[in-house]
UniProtKB/Swiss-Prot annotation:
Residues 50-66 have a biased composition (Low complexity). Belongs to the syntaxin family. Potentially involved in docking of synaptic vesicles at presynaptic active zones. It comes from Drosophila melanogaster. The keyword Membrane applies. This is Syntaxin-4. Its main location: membrane. Residues 239-301 form the t-SNARE coiled-coil homology domain. InterPro entries: SNARE (IPR010989), Syntaxin (IPR045242), T_SNARE_dom (IPR000727). The gene is Syx4. Changing Q97L: In strain: wi3. Residues 91-116 form a coiled coil. Keywords: Coiled coil, Membrane, Neurotransmitter transport, Transmembrane, Transmembrane helix, Transport. Residues 50-81 are annotated as: Disordered.
Amino acid sequence: MGKDRLPELLQRSLSTNSSNSSSNGSLLLNVYSGTTEFIIGNTGGNNNSYSVVSQNSHSCSNNNSSTEPKDRSSSKMTQYGSNVDDILNPYTEIRQQLAQIAANLETMNRMAQTVNLRTFNENEMDELHNKNLRLGNQLMTRFNDFKANLPAENDYSLEARMKRTLFYGLHQTFINLWHKNELFLQNYETKVKKNLRLHTKIINSEASEQEIELLIENKTTKLFVDNFLQETEKERQTLREMMDRFNELRRLEKSIEEVHALFMRIQTLVMEQSEVIQRVEFHAQQATLHVDKGADELDQAEQHQKKARKKKIMLIVILAAVLLVLLLVGIYL
């Protein structure tokens, strides 16, 4: 049923303006979204969504039966259904991973609102953050693979424009989603620092900015609970020793995470700027082909020149022989 809707919606994209790649791309994304939502609805056993789509398909068939030109156009577009599926299916997992990142980010936003409550689980927050990092790495690898297999920029066929528009649309969605994730992490860190400053003031322990950073690195964000757990001076001393031992390791871990995030940002910028580099490379390849072709043509011209010289010599010899024969005939006669 989802496949039956694809040719009809793709026909609308073609009938509006075949040369407008942006409008075709937006309609293609709408087709893909509608197909995905329909498949999810069917797997979940939602009969209401199936009936709505059936009614829409029935109304579309009634309208098409009233206008014969639309019927002919619809019959012509059915042959493109498999091609559209081939374009959309490879991006299904990417869309699912983007949805997973968005869901994790929404969950972390809800958890950040309860950071001061007992129900807040910092380990769960770290787990969601690590999941987003893993998904981001996987998506970056997938986008690199799809980027390498995109059609050439000088290919203006409908299928090529669909592939390019779908790729750049999903890639921009990933970039926007990742920017939101980084903004959330910055806001969350600021909120945690603010809470730690407030807690230190309440327990009459003024902490410097460096000490607050150290508390965050050691995931010590609940000073009231920690204060009750550290009932004796021995336990406090043990905690200080443990913090000193793992301080350098935490700093190293944080530095590695920052470098990793920096490399991901650089990789995103490189992908955004790679289009110009690919065009330059394309023109360089074309110039190389033309140079090779010119060399072949020069070789052919040289061969033709040699053949022409041989023909000229043969003609001169023949003419000399004819003149000699005529002279001899004239002398004897």
